[in-house]
């Protein structure tokens, strides 16, 4: 519903778009998504683009020559070049965004192709507005589905079913700029604020959410020039989407299946699990299973329930994925932020990026 509270009429994420600079990079993206349980179900009718799907999650791999995706890949390498919001009326959403300072992305539309309005978002990536979703979707027009798409979906699924949140890394001094961007165009509001200090570096983060409650975007900014946020920006050659969090209802089974398929996750020190019972009192999870699979748990505060989460290693340049299961907790793992931050920091020390002298 479009109103003063929800001026874009948002209703969740529709897709995330990925690209790479060459065929090898594109094939690596396809292999990665297959490993994550996504099925390639369709190809664009007129472009070099493919649709990967799992549950209600849509990933688009874009290798179209002479496109925004190609230009984006020249700068960033394998990367996230766009994301789409579900909205009630795409044309109305575009008009509202432009009125409030967004810059329109304009491109030529091919024959028999839908015009999907878009503006420039984080790091020059695109933010699309999509008002055809669900049973009548944009893919029905622009893509040709494979005859065995249903079988592919059933065979590949690991239990992931929606995008929980999508995190930005920005340059120092730009966190409020991008928070303001989402406030202006979509009346997003800050629901969490973090100030995390590791042993040697730190970050601050503002978690923004859309009025519909289905689009959550934490925005991270470094406190110094050596943190993992700054390293991301150097490697990515700019600001961008740091990670995509995907929801499951059975994180134990999902993670076990992903590990069996060869997915690598960020390491968590044993000492983390020694402190779980005291840090999250009354959680009722099997700590031995958490430890075996290296799943993180948080309940800050416990009265709001708990959440379980785990992070892959970086898999698209410096971009990674999060697997999350919420059991009443709508946070972002605040209690795990510091543990994870220090885990990445220890990896930076091992790689010589930080000097623990």
Curated annotation (Swiss-Prot):
Domain VOC: 12-132, 162-313
GO biological process, one term: symbiont-mediated cytolysis of host cell
Comment on bound cofactor: Binds 1 Fe cation per subunit.
Alphabetic keyword roster: Cytolysis, Hemolysis, Iron, Metal-binding, Repeat, Toxin, Virulence
GO molecular function, one term: toxin activity
Cofactor: Fe cation
Binding site for Fe cation: 165, 243, 322
Cited InterPro entries: 4OHPhenylPyrv_dOase, 4OHPhenylPyrv_dOase_C, 4OHPhenylPyrv_dOase_N, Glyas_Bleomycin-R_OHBP_Dase, Glyas_Fos-R_dOase_dom, VOC
Record family assignment: Belongs to the 4HPPD family.
Record NCBIfam families: 4HPPD
Name listed for the protein in its UniProt record: Hemolysin VllY
């Amino acid at each position: 519903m479009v109103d003063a509270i929800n001026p874009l009429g948002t209703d969740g994420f529709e897709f995330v778009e990925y690209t790479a600079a060459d065929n090898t990079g594109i094939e690596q993206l396809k292999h990665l998504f297959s490993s994550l349980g996504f099925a390639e179900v369709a190809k664009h009718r007129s472009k070099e683009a493919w649709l990967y799907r799992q549950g209600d999650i849509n990933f688009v791999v874009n290798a179209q020559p002479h496109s925004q995706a190609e230009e984006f890949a020249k700068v960033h390498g394998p990367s996230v070049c766009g994301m789409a919001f579900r909205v009630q009326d795409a044309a109305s959403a575009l008009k509202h965004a432009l009125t409030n300072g967004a810059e329109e992305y304009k491109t030529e539309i091919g024959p028999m192709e839908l015009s999907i309005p878009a503006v420039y978002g984080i790091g020059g990536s695109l933010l699309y507005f999509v008002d055809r979703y669900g049973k009548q979707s944009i893919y029905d027009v622009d893509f040709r589905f494979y005859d065995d798409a249903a079988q592919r979906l059933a065979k590949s699924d690991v239990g992931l079913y929606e995008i929980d949140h999508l995190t930005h890394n920005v340059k120092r001094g730009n966190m409020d700029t991008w928070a303001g961007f989402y406030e202006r165009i979509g009346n997003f509001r800050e629901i969490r604020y973090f100030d995390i200090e590791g042993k040697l570096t730190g970050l601050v983060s503002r978690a923004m959410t859309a009025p519909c409650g289905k689009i959550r975007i934490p925005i991270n900014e470094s406190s110094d020039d050596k943190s993992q946020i700054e390293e991301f920006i150097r490697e990515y050659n700019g600001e961008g989407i740091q990670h995509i969090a995907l929801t499951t209802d059975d994180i134990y089974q999902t993670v076990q299946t992903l590990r069996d398929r060869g997915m690598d996750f960020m390491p968590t020190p044993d000492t983390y699990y020694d402190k779980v019972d005291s840090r999250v009192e009354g959680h009722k999870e099997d700590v031995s299973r958490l430890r075996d699979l290296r799943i993180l748990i948080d309940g800050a505060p416990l009265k709001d329930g708990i959440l379980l989460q785990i992070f892959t290693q970086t898999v698209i340049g410096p971009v990674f994925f999060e697997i999350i299961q919420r059991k009443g907790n709508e946070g972002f793992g605040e209690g795990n932020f510091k543990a994870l931050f220090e885990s990445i920091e220890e990896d930076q020390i091992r790689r010589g990026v930080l000097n623990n002298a």
